[in-house]
Amino acid sequence: MSAPTQTTPVFKALTEASFSDSSLSEEAKQNALYWWNTSANDLARMLHQADYSEEVQRGFLSYYRDNICPRLGGKPDKDSADSGVGWDGNPLEYSFELKGSTKKKSVRFVVDLTELRPADHSNPLSMKHTQEMVDLLAEKTPNFDDTWYKVLKNWFVYAHLTPEEQTALIAKAGQQTSVIIGFDIYPKLTSPDQLPVMGKVYFPPCYVASDKGISRWQAVRQGIQSLPGVESFPNILSSTEIINDYLSEKPDSWQMGTRYLATDLVSPNKARFKVYMRCFDTSFEGIWDYYTLGGRIPNLDEDREKFRQLMDLVSGTTYAETRSKDDMQMGRFTSATGKLTAIYFNISPDNPYPAPKLCIYPSNFAKDDEVIAKGLDEWLEKYGWSDDTKSMEDQVKSVFDHRKLEETTGIFTFIGIGRKEDPTKKELSIQVYMTPELYRTPRY
């Protein structure tokens, strides 16, 4: 397989040495090379766009090449099982954290290492490859701690069941993704033998909910309440109950919109929980009400019109005109791959309220990715968030060249906007999420 023509100097140098001395079989080498030439090249371009040093690019991409690419299995084909990450079933999502919400632009990504290409029918909910990554992070990342991760793994992961029981649970839950692992890529190396990343793990609550006959939200709530020593962090418990109080006023169906509980792989006194929630109401007013938890999170109103304008601009007209007016169906609401605008709540031991973030999914109401990019750039320019050297449209075009943005939607997934970790502080944080569409367009 030839290397992609548009790439970065660091990626090109690492490609020349890729897998040549590996102990992998020839087939496994070709599979790993596929993921290297697609996903790793995407990330290399993103790191280049974000002005990471060559040292950090080399350190991270070497790790990705040697550890993640071989664990992603085969090239996508018609028989590939769907991951819950990409709308097309592919196992990857990337994001830019924009300059302004951090000291400089940064790159993050998540990957589903569940064995899906081909599917592992003997242990379909195994998180073997993800656990191998967690073990490697334990050796290579500063401040690693898996205290709460281990407890949550025992609560959310069902790999201990027989193959038949796992298959039945997958059918009931509606997806096969066991867990997802995420990486925040730091701007500098702390030492030559360390990885410049912070790891986090995302647990889908659908298996616990299906097994125990409870809602997905209650699966998350009970998981948090079961953590040993969590009573020492009253803000975590009180923030969880603020969300629960809001949902208790809604129809029961709303509690099935919880997609993930994510936690950082750091010590409990520093770990944050992120709860990803879909909103059953697709109107702006309904989404805003969820974002504020019905007014339970104070002092958010000054952001309301900024959010409305962002949703209008990325729609190409107005969100009110282009959004779906159809009644929400439960199958759509709980779909693993069908995406919806969502809210995630950052629960921290330091803050008495959950910090909300609106995750807009513009593909559901915009004509194409070019409309989304231009609308986003207009909003960033208006509110002083634009990059002085390059528009977001040009940056995304520099990362993805497998098709034109004006062809359709799909590259942009979510645009995240909300308060930073402390919801009482007024600074906003913005992320732009993208997926490589490798199930729709394998590229090679």
Swiss-Prot record:
Description of the deletion phenotype: Impairs the production of herqueinone, but accumulates phenalenone.
Pathway connected to this protein: Secondary metabolite biosynthesis
Uppermost EC category: transferase
UniProt keyword terms in alphabetical order: Transferase
Signal peptide span: none
Pfam families given in the database record: Trp_DMAT
InterPro entries: Aro_prenylTrfase, Aro_prenylTrfase_DMATS
Any one GO BP annotation for this protein: alkaloid metabolic process
GO-annotated molecular function: transferase activity, transferring alkyl or aryl (other than methyl) groups
Catalytic activity entry: 2,3,4,7,9-pentahydroxy-6-methyl-1H-phenalen-1-one + dimethylallyl diphosphate = 2,4,7,9-tetrahydroxy-6-methyl-8-(2-methylbut-3-en-2-yl)-1-oxo-1H-phenalen-3-ol + diphosphate
Coiled coil: none
EC number: 2.5.1.-
Cited NCBIfam families: arom_pren_DMATS
Function: Prenyltransferase; part of the gene cluster that mediates the biosynthesis of phenalenones such as herqueinone, compounds that have been reported to treat tumors, bacterial infections and/or mycoses, and rheumatic diseases. The non-reducing polyketide synthase phnA synthesizes the heptaketide backbone and cyclizes it into the angular, hemiketal-containing naphtho-gamma-pyrone prephenalenone. The product template (PT) domain of phnA catalyzes only the C4-C9 aldol condensation, which is unprecedented among known PT domains.
Family stated for the protein in its record: Belongs to the tryptophan dimethylallyltransferase family.
PANTHER family, per the entry: INDOLE PRENYLTRANSFERASE TDIB-RELATED, PRENYLTRANSFERASE ASQH1-RELATED
Protein name per the record: Prenyltransferase phnF
Organism: Penicillium herquei
Lineage: Eukaryota, Fungi, Dikarya, Ascomycota, Pezizomycotina
